[in-house]
């Protein structure tokens, strides 16, 4: 078994959609980024890449490459699943924490889990998403942006 840790953060931006876990969440702001800026999916991507020793999302999908401009992060996650499979691993479990002051995410978490599970071809009960605030502290507390942490557990395929 291997463990990977992931982290991502993005600034708030006007005139952008807020996408987390592949789900569009109604909010006055979205997040800045070269892709759809889905910080939750990006952190999960980094956790998986770490678990298989394949760098990070910026290395695999550089923001200097126009092919990734505006791309759905779920498509990137799908490509990473292929890498996990090719390296002889299977995803066992994912845990993540989204840190933002608002909006409240609880109503959207089941849909996020379902979308991520669908892409990763695994049961949604093997994916956990927690939503926290930063109690008004730091850049998240000042509502300048969002931060996400993720951990992925992978195991060697037994084929």
Curated annotation (Swiss-Prot):
Amino-acid positions noted as binding a divalent metal cation in the UniProt annotation, renumbered to this chain: 8, 10, 42
Required cofactor(s): a divalent metal cation
Pathway involvement of the protein, from the record: Isoprenoid biosynthesis; isopentenyl diphosphate biosynthesis via DXP pathway; isopentenyl diphosphate from 1-deoxy-D-xylulose 5-phosphate: step 4/6
Site positions (Transition state stabilizer): 34, 133
EC number: 4.6.1.12
Single GO MF descriptor: 2-C-methyl-D-erythritol 2,4-cyclodiphosphate synthase activity
Keyword Magnesium listed: no
InterPro entries for this protein: MECDP_synthase, MECDP_synthase_CS, MECDP_synthase_sf
Co-factor binding comment: Binds 1 divalent metal cation per subunit.
Binding site residues for 4-CDP-2-C-methyl-D-erythritol 2-phosphate: 8-10, 34-35, 56-58, 61-65, 139, 142
Pfam entry (one): YgbB
Keyword Metal-binding among UniProt keywords: yes
Keywords: Isoprene biosynthesis, Lyase, Metal-binding
Enzyme kind, highest EC tier: lyase
Reaction catalysis annotation: 4-CDP-2-C-methyl-D-erythritol 2-phosphate = 2-C-methyl-D-erythritol 2,4-cyclic diphosphate + CMP
GO terms for biological process, alphabetical: isopentenyl diphosphate biosynthetic process, methylerythritol 4-phosphate pathway; terpenoid biosynthetic process
Subunit structure as annotated in this protein's UniProt entry: Homotrimer.
Role summary: Involved in the biosynthesis of isopentenyl diphosphate (IPP) and dimethylallyl diphosphate (DMAPP), two major building blocks of isoprenoid compounds. Catalyzes the conversion of 4-diphosphocytidyl-2-C-methyl-D-erythritol 2-phosphate (CDP-ME2P) to 2-C-methyl-D-erythritol 2,4-cyclodiphosphate (ME-CPP) with a corresponding release of cytidine 5-monophosphate (CMP).
Family: Belongs to the IspF family.
Protein name: 2-C-methyl-D-erythritol 2,4-cyclodiphosphate synthase
């Amino acid at each position: 078994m291997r463990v990977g840790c992931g982290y991502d953060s993005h600034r708030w931006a006007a005139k952008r959609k807020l996408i987390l876990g592949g789900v569009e969440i109604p909010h006055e702001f979205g997040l800045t980024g070269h892709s759809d800026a889905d910080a939750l999916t990006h952190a999960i991507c980094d956790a998986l890449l770490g678990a298989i020793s394949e760098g990070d999302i910026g290395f695999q999908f550089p923001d200097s490459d126009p092919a990734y401009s505006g791309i759905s992060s779920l498509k990137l996650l799908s490509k990473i699943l292929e890498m996990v499979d090719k390296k002889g691993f299977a995803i066992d479990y994912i845990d993540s924490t989204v840190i933002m002051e608002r909006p409240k995410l609880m109503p959207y978490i089941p849909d996020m889990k379902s979308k991520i599970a669908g892409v990763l071809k695994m049961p949604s009960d093997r994916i956990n998403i927690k939503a926290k605030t930063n109690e008004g502290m730091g850049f998240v507390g000042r509502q300048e942006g969002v931060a996400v942490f993720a951990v992925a557990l992978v195991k060697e395929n037994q084929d």
